[in-house]
Amino acid sequence: MGSCQSNENSEGNARNKEIEKQLNADKRAGSSIVKLLLLGAGECGKSTVLKQMQILHSNGFTEEEVNEKRAIVYNNTVSAMCTILRAMDGVLHLPLENGQKEAEKAIVMKVQENGEEGEALTEEVSKAIQSLWADPGVKKAFEMRSEYQLPDSAKYFLDNCQRISEPGYRPNDQDILYSRVATTGVVEVKFKIKELDFRVFDVGGQRSERRKWIHCFDNVESIIFITAISEYDQVLFEDETTNRMIESMQLFNSICNSTWFLSTAMILFMNKKDLFMEKIQRVNITTAFPDYEGGQNYEEAVSFIKQKFAELNLNPDKKTIYMHETCATDTNQVQLVISSVIDTIIQKNLQKAGMM
């Protein structure tokens, strides 16, 4: 595992240097290059949006990428169950309702302890995960997931465990969209639309990653800032004293009003609307916004959050914030939103070139 991590870091560093070199070259290139920067706090859905752009505009995933994602899917499936089981033993103090499933728990936990969670799921491991996922105690722990760090994709992978463990399994686009590995450094997707070369960059969302890269992108055309509106009752992975929504707003404030991006268009994706729609019925947004006095319904709550973000813009006369409610794993919905964003950017480029 240590060697694997070292290789990943080495490859990431090489990729980052290459991208930085290309960014400098782009500054000397013509105006046909349009650079978009994806920003947001960790786990907001940036990488999923980038993967959607790859599906929609860049010929999807290569066979090599699909093979890489297979190991990530296996990892995400095992890790999801192990995270729930550890939370049951720890912060939740919840037992398995069926005590006879302790043996199955040991089988799954051993996979992670041995560092084998990225390997194909054996029939024994798959059946153990499916059996545990059906346990009422595990279901209760899942419902209490805001009290510990559980990725949003956990339910998807646990629901699909049987299919994922079949011999010859090949991840489909939806599996890849839900797959999750923390972004380090910068990841890039390129595509061409109407004679414009788009280059989209996803910068790591954890605090340490953001600090490393922000200065490299002072000449981007637009920033797509992504906030996970469903995370108003959750805390950061890297700082469990900070509310995720508040962190996201603080980051948006610093980017929107940064001297690096005074003339850069701001596009706000209010992501994970599907999870927000379900959660708002159970948990009021007063968790993050004590001054909220509206109803516990989607329309009022989203409108309030939009207003909160709009108020962070210190130059509303000069800078417009384009807001979209999104579900990054819904390809059809994301296609409509991204098409709208790209059309807006193309119009601005034509205006800049004096062609409108």
UniProtKB/Swiss-Prot annotation:
GTP binds at residues 40-47, 177-183, 202-206, 271-274, 328. One of its GO terms (molecular function) is GTPase activity. Keywords: Cell projection, Chemotaxis, Cilium, GTP-binding, Lipoprotein, Magnesium, Metal-binding, Myristate, Nucleotide-binding, Olfaction, Palmitate, Sensory transduction, Transducer. Coiled coil: none annotated. Residues 175-183 are annotated as: G2 motif. Residues 198-207 are annotated as: G3 motif. Disruption phenotype: Defective in chemotactic responses to attractants and repellents and in osmotic and mechanosensory avoidance. A lipid is attached at residue 2 (N-myristoyl glycine). GO terms for cellular component: cytoplasm; dendrite; heterotrimeric G-protein complex; neuronal cell body; non-motile cilium. Pfam families: G-alpha (PF00503). Mg(2+) binds at residues 47, 183. Residues 326-331 are annotated as: G5 motif. One of its GO terms (biological process) is adenylate cyclase-modulating G protein-coupled receptor signaling pathway. G proteins are composed of 3 units; alpha, beta and gamma. The alpha chain contains the guanine nucleotide binding site. This is Guanine nucleotide-binding protein alpha-17 subunit. The lineage of its organism: Eukaryota, Metazoa, Ecdysozoa, Nematoda, Chromadorea.
